[in-house]
Amino acid sequence: MPNSERHGGKKDGSGGASGTLQPSSGGGSSNSRERHRLVSKHKRHKSKHSKDMGLVTPEAASLGTVIKPLVEYDDISSDSDTFSDDMAFKLDRRENDERRGSDRSDRLHKHRHHQHRRSRDLLKAKQTEKEKSQEVSSKSGSMKDRISGSSKRSNEETDDYGKAQVAKSSSKESRSSKLHKEKTRKERELKSGHKDRSKSHRKRETPKSYKTVDSPKRRSRSPHRKWSDSSKQDDSPSGASYGQDYDLSPSRSHTSSNYDSYKKSPGSTSRRQSVSPPYKEPSAYQSSTRSPSPYSRRQRSVSPYSRRRSSSYERSGSYSGRSPSPYGRRRSSSPFLSKRSLSRSPLPSRKSMKSRSRSPAYSRHSSSHSKKKRSSSRSRHSSISPVRLPLNSSLGAELSRKKKERAAAAAAAKMDGKESKGSPVFLPRKENSSVEAKDSGLESKKLPRSVKLEKSAPDTELVNVTHLNTEVKNSSDTGKVKLDENSEKHLVKDLKAQGTRDSKPIALKEEIVTPKETETSEKETPPPLPTIASPPPPLPTTTPPPQTPPLPPLPPIPALPQQPPLPPSQPAFSQVPASSTSTLPPSTHSKTSAVSSQANSQPPVQVSVKTQVSVTAAIPHLKTSTLPPLPLPPLLPGDDDMDSPKETLPSKPVKKEKEQRTRHLLTDLPLPPELPGGDLSPPDSPEPKAITPPQQPYKKRPKICCPRYGERRQTESDWGKRCVDKFDIIGIIGEGTYGQVYKAKDKDTGELVALKKVRLDNEKEGFPITAIREIKILRQLIHRSVVNMKEIVTDKQDALDFKKDKGAFYLVFEYMDHDLMGLLESGLVHFSEDHIKSFMKQLMEGLEYCHKKNFLHRDIKCSNILLNNSGQIKLADFGLARLYNSEESRPYTNKVITLWYRPPELLLGEERYTPAIDVWSCGCILGELFTKKPIFQANLELAQLELISRLCGSPCPAVWPDVIKLPYFNTMKPKKQYRRRLREEFSFIPSAALDLLDHMLTLDPSKRCTAEQTLQSDFLKDVELSKMAPPDLPHWQDCHELWSKKRRRQRQSGVVVEEPPPSKTSRKETTSGTSTEPVKNSSPAPPQPAPGKVESGAGDAIGLADITQQLNQSELAVLLNLLQSQTDLSIPQMAQLLNIHSNPEMQQQLEALNQSISALTEATSQQQDSETMAPEESLKEAPSAPVILPSAEQTTLEASSTPADMQNILAVLLSQLMKTQEPAGSLEENNSDKNSGPQGPRRTPTMPQEEAAACPPHILPPEKRPPEPPGPPPPPPPPPLVEGDLSSAPQELNPAVTAALLQLLSQPEAEPPGHLPHEHQALRPMEYSTRPRPNRTYGNTDGPETGFSAIDTDERNSGPALTESLVQTLVKNRTFSGSLSHLGESSSYQGTGSVQFPGDQDLRFARVPLALHPVVGQPFLKAEGSSNSVVHAETKLQNYGELGPGTTGASSSGAGLHWGGPTQSSAYGKLYRGPTRVPPRGGRGRGVPY
């Protein structure tokens, strides 16, 4: 097809009708020789091919007429690469190889060749000799020199030959000159490029028997082959349009068959046919024979991948092989480039003949062709040049012979011929060129190939076409039909296989050729038309139906018997050409007869081309159907890569890329239809594929392409439909090991989800192993207490985007409103014993499930335990989890589990651990639920082990026999031996819970209870989750670890700002800066607002106005709720709300505070401004100095100064309230001036302040104050003097301190009433300013709480420093950040909780009263909210120092004193609820490095 069309085009371009006829005889003889040579090659390589060719010969002859281009072997071989049709490809390749071999052998001995073939052989021999001499000269010279030399020689020869041809006929001359040019060009290419090409071909073909045979001969052959190919390529536009012929591969196959028929039809029709059918059968379809080379080449070429592969491969490999530089050679020598350069440059002498003879269109074509090919298919360019090289090699062989024969007369005639070609051929070329230009416009990339092929091919092709037409006429029409059918079948297969790929290029090629060939064909067409006349109607079918029908016949085609089927198939194909012709009538009808065969191959292509523009989808469909053939490219790499890359590279790579892209689009649309087509194609390929390799490629290609498409489709459904953009991201709620966690809403269902981001950009080794583990494990864990992973989505629409730009995956989890750490640190909630039972029951059920599934969680901590508002617990974050084999004792890393929850065996270096490690972590959480803060808070492994030893006893062989076997036992064991005092420290918790805690925190892992045993414990066995009332959780605020961290940082930053800046303004600024954020965290604020409200409404209004501006809606709502509910409350009422009333002393103090507040409200508000400055400064100083500020006075001062800054006032009020409480409690605890000393140190210690910041929400004071009633029992200060002092101090301080505090509080409250809510929210900022560091309790910020918070925070970081500054005063409990943090934390937790959760506040206060009774009374009176802080501060000091809280703090922090102190235990027990809150979170918030 390509040849005939190209011939037609070339003929038209070369010399109109006469050109066509003359070239037919001359070119036909050379073509027949080439075919002869190819046939001999083919026979030499395969008698099968000869037989098959013989069978196909009739069809080939007829198709040769119609599909001459396909017959061109070099064309076909390059086209075969281009074509998806492996048969054609194989045939081309075989023919090329055989031609190469046969070029030599043909020279030596012409196998059965018709006169044409013999004459061609003679021409080829002459040309070969010339080429050999040229090659020798070019070999002597550089490859470029060879190319240029051969081009010049070729140009000269072409000129001579062109002149001779001009004498013969302008068309023949133009064609022959073009052929000669192409020959010389290809000779040059062959010489320089052919060596490389033969090398690359050998490399490629080495896998092929043909290649192996040819490779040695190739250099000698390669010129011949290139000449032969050249002539054949010239004969068939397919050579010129190899890149296109890739797509035309079927056409080309047919063309090669037809062309062989052409060449053979007169005398070597059988041979040519034998070549063609075997070509079809073995090369095109018998991918096995040539399956790797022709079939896989073609099909690979057909397949976008093979094409691309072959194209790029050929560029660098095959093309560079053929031409020194695939691009350079192509550009200079490539049919398009060389034509362009020839027509445009001195080389034009030859090229001008071709391009001129071809016509401006050709030059345009070559320019547009080469441009497009260069631009669109640089890869194809190389492919094209290889294509052309094949044309040049095959046509070049013929042309070189012709040139040599004509050389004598051609020298003079060439110049004339050039001129004549320039004019006559140029005009037809112009006409064709206009059509071609349009075609090239349609597919310039395809056109460049077809143009090149046509340019070289038209001359030879016209001759060949005419010759073939004569031969075809001479030969049986049946043969023609068979050849046509075979060609068409090949074309169909190629079109089907390549159709998608090649059909576009082919269509362009053929369309391009069509104009020229149409003219030529018009002259030539009459004979072939009758053959195709009947078939034309099916043309429409040709694109899809013939592809499918030819495929079935194609398998027969491989077998000689299939020739009969081929005629039937030929009708189909003929119909395709006919319809193609009909479609192409303007250009094609004239071509029809010559193009008939071409029409069979090319018309389908043309139809494809025409259809391609519109039926591009169909072509992609063809591609899709071709995709099954695409598997051939895998063959391509071996044998086919060399040939197919050459042929396929130029046009196929670019086209392929485009087609692949189109495929993506088309694939999506046509895939369903094309998959059937592909299925049909694969059948065709399978039949020709009688050779398994092609089928495998087919299957592979489909698997690669279709599956890829399918995968992409699945990807689109999996990725595209479920991309991250399907979720509305609400905000960030956490930070994981490999990314962030976002709260999002599913746009489709409206469901809330958590998106855990898995970032890949920073991953050196791809997908994070932790994420892979988590995904793998979570898919196996389905339990109500294990978080459910719903799906995985990405931030890309499909996988290809992922390759280009590393994106991220998102694990989609069900959304949980809170995590345990956020809730505990928030101070917004207090968990009752029933709640703790429920939580532990669910937690242990989930853990037992994991352990039964043999998974170790290895990272259980409060932040990985999620809760929703209904009280449901889920275990999350399985990034460190792993499968555990109990039967196999193997080492695992001991660097797992967050330090605070890490069991002693891991700290001592155990690597063969068991699920008991998770039970220890759950035991730590159980203690934390009661104490409200982590019970072991250290920042170093050694310190962590020390804390554990102080509470649980030192690890020793007596209690833990195997401990001496642990690696770090000797290096890590505590210097001091401790006895186990866990029961003493936690005596305040229920006995059932204490028993469970004792068992869970057993040092020896072998004696530690299992998850299953915990569920059978008295504490959990009777728990019925369904009957448990859900805890009162803050629905208005999602409490997550990240949120609590931010609050802590804000408070810390505020405190830090306060400390450094001497002026309160900076503190205020800092406070205000932080206030907005703290406001969000101001959940604790509600309790404080209540006190403020109680104090005065005017101050409330003022404070509210300022603070409101800085608060969120949620914060404001909380404050408003608190204010509204508590605005009218009196201090006693506030005390009740805060549970402070439980203590009679507290009530009395609150009443006194109420009175003093009312009296001092006005004066205090004024004084506070002035006082605040001094207090703040003093506070700043105090933080730096362990000395305690005159908490009451300073607090008052700070509060008073705050009026200037409402936020500062709020912060000051909270601080004052805290300090007020602290002074009473902290002074007592400090065993120093209760008024100034205790408060100062607590708050003064920079470390405590920091920790306070860490524990920012020390709003517990109000809540903890209520627990103070339990305080009286604690007052016996069994712990250090602190408790005694606290108990006495509260009473002692209560009068003086209370008066001062009441005054201070009353002043702040006058303003704070409105500010208290703000205080709560703004207070945090204020607290930051007022107190060096925000404590969990806002009150803490001002005084002890701040110190406690700081201590808690610093407990891990700078426990000693805090201990030194505060501990001296505070006692060992305080020394431990735990004690301070407990109090501070309690304050923050309770304070926060008191406002929203009175019950929580009550519990906390129940605990607080111990230390706070007297002192707390004042704080509570002063400001319920502020009082909270104060009470809590005292509670911290007293509770931690005197009571269990202090003990808890100490035990938690690891300070030994209070842990051991029995009084502390009792105090703790009394203050249990309050202190629990205080110690747990405060310490954690501050000390926890979450």
Swiss-Prot record:
Modified residues (Phosphothreonine): T57, T514, T692, T893, T1244, T1246
Region (Disordered): 1-703, 1047-1098, 1161-1189, 1220-1348, 1441-1460, 1466-1490
Bias kind Polar residues: ranges: 250-276, 466-478, 1071-1083, 1161-1171
Superkingdom, natural source: Eukaryota
GO MF annotations in UniProt: ATP binding; cyclin binding; cyclin-dependent protein serine/threonine kinase activity; protein kinase activity; protein kinase binding; protein serine kinase activity; RNA polymerase II CTD heptapeptide repeat kinase activity
Entry EC no(s): 2.7.11.22, 2.7.11.23
Main location: nucleus
Group of enzyme by EC: transferase
Pfam families hit by this protein: Pkinase (PF00069)
Matching InterPro entries: CDK, Kinase-like_dom_sf, Prot_kinase_dom, Protein_kinase_ATP_BS, Ser/Thr_kinase_AS
Basic and acidic residues compositional bias, start-end: 1-13, 87-106, 120-134, 142-162, 184-195, 226-235, 428-458, 479-525, 654-666
Catalytic residues in the record: D859
Free-text description of this protein's post-translational modifications in UniProt: Phosphorylation at Thr-893 increases kinase activity.
Modified residues (Phosphotyrosine): Y73
Family: Belongs to the protein kinase superfamily. CMGC Ser/Thr protein kinase family. CDC2/CDKX subfamily.
Complexes and interactors: Interacts with CCNL1 and CCNL2. Interacts with CCNK. (Microbial infection) Interacts with human herpes virus 1 (HHV-1) transcriptional regulator ICP22.
Protein name stated in the entry: Cyclin-dependent kinase 12
Species assigned in the record: Homo sapiens (Human)
